[in-house]
């Protein structure tokens, strides 16, 4: 069983670039189509670790979907980000949806 370090709705930072993002989905291992060596220069160990679908903002404040290895992410310690309120809102919305009971007819 593979354990993930981050959860859906959690705010994270790109370790190298410092961008703030929100985890929207998790894959236990790399699960996009098999990349060519030029497209993804990572080893098999990295591909076997969890990968995250993360929404981040580009320099213009527009949302960007990224697919990142666990090793590329770090925990975000702050809960509020006045410079990027949309990331805070997205994280809160996802967490509320995960906690809200689902009514079945």
Swiss-Prot record:
* GO terms (BP aspect): protein homotrimerization; response to heat
State the residue spans of region: Disordered. 75-105
SUPFAM superfamilies in alphabetical order: YccV-like
What is a single molecular function from GO for this protein? identical protein binding
Q: Which InterPro entries match?
A: Hemimethylated_DNA-bd_dom, Hemimethylated_DNA-bd_sf, HspQ
Q: Which UniProt keywords apply?
A: Cytoplasm, Stress response
- In which broad location class does this protein mainly occur, judging by the first location in its UniProt entry? cytoplasm
Its GO CC terms are: cytoplasm
The conditions that induce or repress this protein are given as: By heat shock. Transcribed by the sigma-32 subunit of RNA polymerase.
Spell out the NCBIfam families in the cross-references. Answer: PRK14129.1, yccV
| HAMAP family named in the record | HspQ (MF_01194)
Task: State the family named in the UniProt similarity comment for this chain.
Answer: Belongs to the HspQ family.
Role according to the record? Involved in the degradation of certain denaturated proteins, including DnaA, during heat shock stress.
Q: What protein am I looking at?
A: Heat shock protein HspQ
Organism whose genome encodes this protein: Escherichia coli (strain K12)
- Its encoding gene is what? hspQ
């Amino acid at each position: 069983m593979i354990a993930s370090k981050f959860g859906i709705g959690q705010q994270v930072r790109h370790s190298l670039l410092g961008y703030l993002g929100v985890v929207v989905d998790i894959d236990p291992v790399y699960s996009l189509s098999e990349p060519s060596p030029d497209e993804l220069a990572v080893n098999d160990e990295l591909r076997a670790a969890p990968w995250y679908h993360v929404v981040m903002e580009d320099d213009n404040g527009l949302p960007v979907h990224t697919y990142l290895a666990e090793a590329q992410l770090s925990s975000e310690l702050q809960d509020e980000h006045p410079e990027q309120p949309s990331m805070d809102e997205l994280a809160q919305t996802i967490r509320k949806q995960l906690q809200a009971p689902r009514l079945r007819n």
